[in-house]
Amino acid sequence: MMNSMRSRLLGVLACGLTLLVGASVYAQSLQEVMQQRGLTENNLLAAAKTYHPSGLKDEYVVFSSGGQSGQVIVYGVPSMRILKYIAVFTPEPWQGYGYGEVESMEILEQGKIDGREIHWGDTHHPALSETGGDYDGEYLFINDKANPRVAVIDLKTFETKQIVVNPLFKSEHGGTFVTPNTEYIIEAAQYPAPYANEYQPLDNFLEKYRGGVTYWKFDRNAKLSLTRKSIKKLKKEGVPTKGLNKLTYKEFEGTEAFIAAVGEKIGSSEAKKYQKTLLKHATKQGRIATEQSFTVEMPPYMQDVSDAGKGFSEGWSVTNSVNTELYIGGYGKGNTKWKNRLAYEAGMSAKDTDYMHIVNWKAAEKLFKAGKFRKVNGHALIPMKEMVEANALFLLPEPKSPHGADISPDGRYVIVSGKLDTHTTVYYFEKIFSLVEKKDFADIDPWGIPILDMKKAMHTQVNVGLGPLHTQYDSVKGVVYTSLYVDSMVVRWDYLKGKVLGKIPIHYNIGHLLTAEGDTVSPDGKYLVSLNKLAIDRFTQVGPLHPQNHQLIDIT
């Protein structure tokens, strides 16, 4: 009987809609399991650290971009169990997103570009909303790299609530990143293009093609409503509530409309008196306010990822760039003759450095409110000239082809890795601000933007390895982790002392990485997740396309 059952289990077991292919191995003890499966004690320890029996919840939740699925993947840490796929730019029949469910169909319609339906996306850089530079867990923002769009996800429901199309960009890579209190969501262009939706030949590249950084204003009180539960809470705090039940579940657009509606029931003077308490207990829905948003014009370099200053550097943001050589389509600056055309990659990598764009976004906000912008495609564009005159826009050389600008928890340092440079560079904001204040500029770029001196702004430079990309911070002061794409490693190093502390081998070709709250004012450390682009020979073969995988590392 046992032999018969075992032979059946070695075949295919079909149960409901699930197919299980494989063998059943019986064991009575850990030692037998270790022996039969060839496991070590370290393997068992790793399994015990990540195993979560039913009912035990994870310590952390990770939001990961789904790439060209157009979704966001949600999984737990340390279990690494997938909890949900959030539908964003792509219809999702299992959840009814975009299929018959009216609200989601309307949200997808918001993503139309020039009247064309675009029901796919390339999700890339998710960002959690923050208060005081720490995650508050209220909203998640995600960009579409292929079609320049940004989506708002409400984490009360883990559902997409808004899609906004960038009216100026034709592509983007550097989004989304939030300022410390989620005043703005930062989105940067990738490939320079004419802002106007019309053809311009490459002969006009320097005059007509532009990059840019958009600051999307986020309004947490875009929609307000009252529930019976919130009315009970208001009553307990001494707020008059007579007549408020008639307002339950009605949505009001913005604070002014909400307070006016409440004032009609309890009196306008009472509504103003208790406004703070009313807003505290109201149900809020945050949305991007496009009419309060603006873009800072940038030269036709290829802008990349960004970060927002915090603490010492709050009010400023930084954005990487590549191709400051201005090789587009293989044509260099002033060179449009086919016979002089260079290989694209060679032309884009000719210089040893590219530029970090340093923006005083609070100064840009003042320019916007003062009307120092022009409308392009119905959107506010602040010219480079206005930014330079306001002492609000600077360039700083950084290692060639950078992909990562990561500001320290105290806001005093920014770490930049150049993909084509083995060094990772640490800049010191005190030095940067001193150069700005003294107007100590090394040069001016062709569009009049002051260029700071790289060496004068540096704190240190460390040789970390081949293909450095992104950096995340540990809870231990000075300790960071940087991904090494070519070496397939994570390097642990001290950015204050400027020395490498160790390296961790990774499965294969790490790209992004994350540590627990590693981009906030108070990193937790504990865990590191390596987001590996390839996983050659690591898993069961599933066809010619190699699977990607996320690798959990204990950094305690």
What kind of feature is each model-predicted range?
Residues M5-S7, T18, Q36, G286:
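Short, intrinsically disordered low-complexity segments
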Residues V12-G22:
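Bacterial N-terminal signal peptides
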